[in-house]
Design a protein with these regions (language model features):
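A short, Trp-centered hydrophobic/proline-enriched beta-strand micro-motif
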Residues: 49-69
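N-terminal secretory signal peptides that target proteins for export/translocation
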Residues: 1-18
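Cleaved targeting-peptide boundary
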Residues: 39-46
Length: 208
């Protein structure tokens, strides 16, 4: 009987050790999962607060398609975004459902729906508070990079959005499709502008 018990005890100890190790692994897994979710929630909250403070925002931008560069100024107010390109002189005005392209040199304008147009990304990035919640992101001391594949008008677009970290600043957007790559960089951020009432009108004064 004593010999049998001596055989049982090591087996029991091994079993308990395995159970203890398994329990420890489960605890570590949930700690990592909780920490990851907490970090993600903190980043989401930080970005959402940043987006909410863009109602009187302006910045300079440089847009590139790989072969040419364009410069201009961007303005945001009351759920509308205005992009003024310097050369040629033209404006892109965007709201949630519609947009207008204005050629100031020719004094022409053309309206379009933003729902299936890549320019809708401007609205989503700058004015949709929940847009970033479904993104995968990487964070370090210098930057936060959000990345996601989205479908616009049946085309897959790889979207990357770069924020400077500490302080949080939107620095660059890269949208890549099968045949095109567009990058837009932002500088000279201003959050406390006073805008003229007509700046966000879909009809320029000379066409009214």
């Amino acid at each position: 009987m004593e010999s049998f018990q001596k055989q049982i005890m090591p087996a029991k100890d091994k079993f308990l050790k395995k159970q203890s190790n398994l329990f420890l692994l489960v605890i570590i897994f949930f700690i990592i999962l909780f920490s990851t979710n907490t970090i993600a929630e903190q980043v989401d909250s930080k970005v959402i607060n940043y987006i909410k403070n863009l109602n009187f925002f302006s910045s300079k931008f440089i847009q590139s398609n790989g072969t040419s560069l364009e410069e201009g100024n961007m303005y945001i107010k009351d759920a509308k975004i205005r992009l003024d390109y310097l050369s040629p002189d033209r404006t892109l005005l965007i709201s949630k459902k519609k947009g207008v392209y204005i050629n100031h040199e020719l004094k022409e304008q053309s309206f379009f729906s933003t729902e299936k147009n890549i320019v809708r990304l401007f609205y989503d990035i700058f004015l949709d508070y929940s847009f970033f919640s479904s993104f995968v992101f990487k964070e370090n001391n210098k930057e936060i990079v959000f990345e996601k594949k989205i479908i616009i008008d049946s085309k897959i677009t790889n979207l990357k959005i770069f924020f400077e970290n500490k302080p949080l600043l939107l620095r660059k957007i890269i949208a890549k499709t099968e045949n095109e790559l567009i990058s837009i960089s932002f500088s000279e951020h201003n959050y406390n502008n006073t805008f003229d009432e007509n700046l966000f009108s879909f009809v320029p004064m000379y066409l009214d």
